[in-house]
């Protein structure tokens, strides 16, 4: 009798486990979608001005708001100042998923 009870509990736990994993993967995908403002336009505005090395500044901002795999590819960015202390970063050779 104990064996049957243990078997049933194990079956119930294993049936709940995969559904819990799929919900976790789904929420992780939503977080990644929120962190990816760069695609498809590959342009992003920020509330600051371009520094002396604006291209590096844009790349640092890209890395902080994008997937860490960006570091594995060669990305070059262009920084352009806009009125009211805004800057536009354009990274045209960035690979979008």
UniProtKB/Swiss-Prot annotation:
Localization: Secreted
Tissue distribution of the protein: Flower buds and stems.
Gene Ontology cellular-component annotations: extracellular region
Top-rank taxon: Eukaryota
Signal peptide from the UniProt entry: 1-24
Cysteine-cysteine disulfides: 39-96, 50-79, 58-89, 77-91
InterPro entries named among the record's database cross-references: SCRL (IPR010682)
Keywords per UniProt: Antimicrobial, Disulfide bond, Fungicide, Plant defense, Secreted, Signal
GO biological process per UniProt: defense response to fungus; killing of cells of another organism; signal transduction
PANTHER family assigned to the protein according to its UniProt record, in alphabetical order: DEFENSIN-LIKE PROTEIN 245-RELATED (PTHR34450:SF10)
Protein family according to the UniProt entry: Belongs to the DEFL family.
Protein name from the UniProt record: Defensin-like protein 246
Highest classification ranks of the organism: Eukaryota, Viridiplantae, Streptophyta, Embryophyta, Tracheophyta
């Amino acid at each position: 009798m104990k064996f049957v009870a243990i078997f049933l509990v194990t079956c119930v736990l294993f049936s709940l486990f995969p559904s819990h994993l799929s919900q976790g993967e789904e929420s992780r995908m939503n977080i990644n979608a929120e962190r990816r403002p760069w695609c498809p336009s590959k342009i992003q505005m920020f509330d600051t001005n371009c520094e002396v090395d604006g291209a590096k500044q844009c790349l640092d901002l890209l890395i902080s708001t994008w997937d860490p795999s960006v570091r594995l590819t060669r990305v070059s960015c262009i920084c352009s100042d806009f009125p009211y202390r805004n800057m536009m970063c354009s990274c045209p050779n960035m690979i979008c998923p």
